[in-house]
């Protein structure tokens, strides 16, 4: 039994980042419900007890990361999903992905270890961080390819404002 190891490519972290960046606070209830109901379909009800708290920390990691990047003014972000994407948008998303993955890997595992009374090693935290970053990159790459194909087939139009 290897215990809790985390995912090496965790796609939902990319969903958290994209949905919060584009839709703001309005996305949080839907993201939270997805966080707690998705795993409960796979595992038993016991899973729901401690994951509700861990899900809150995962979502707060993204919120805090967005606020840190906004506060630092390292990059600005175009908050309209229909406008043309530029380098500043990618830079903003990359910073949010890295910072939120770091916070998520540390604080979610801290909460899980406190509630479950188990020690979680540094390799698990590193695996969470790598999984969140890689999953976000895969998710965003998929969206870029999909929207590019939709635009080429004239099923989607970019506003130039």
PLM regions and their residue ranges:
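Hydrophobic alpha-helical membrane segments of integral membrane proteins
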Residues: 29-34, 49, 53
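Short glycine-rich loop/turn motifs that provide flexible caps or phosphate-binding loops at active sites
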Residues: 23, 33, 130, 134
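Interfacial segments of multi-pass membrane proteins
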Residues: 24, 37-42
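Generic transmembrane alpha-helix motif of multi-pass integral membrane proteins
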Residues: 11-27, 31
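Membrane-embedded alpha-helical hairpins and interfacial helices in multi-pass inner-membrane proteins
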Residues: 1-18, 40-159
């Amino acid at each position: 039994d290897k215990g809790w190891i985390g995912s090496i490519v965790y796609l939902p972290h990319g969903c958290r980042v994209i949905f919060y960046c584009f839709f703001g606070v309005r996305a949080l209830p839907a993201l939270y419900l997805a966080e707690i109901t998705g795993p409960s379909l796979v595992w038993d009800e016991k899973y729901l007890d401690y994951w509700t708290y861990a899900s809150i920390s995962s979502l707060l990691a993204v919120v805090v990361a967005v606020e840190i990047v906004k506060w630092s003014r390292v990059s600005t972000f175009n908050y309209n999903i229909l406008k043309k994407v530029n380098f500043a948008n990618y830079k903003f998303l990359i910073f949010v992905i890295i910072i939120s993955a770091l916070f998520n890997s540390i604080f979610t595992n801290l909460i899980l270890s406190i509630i479950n009374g188990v020690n979680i090693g540094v390799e698990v935290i590193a695996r969470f961080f790598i999984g969140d970053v890689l999953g976000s990159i895969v998710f965003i790459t998929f969206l870029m390819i999909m929207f590019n194909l939709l635009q080429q087939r004239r099923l989607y139009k970019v506003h130039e404002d």
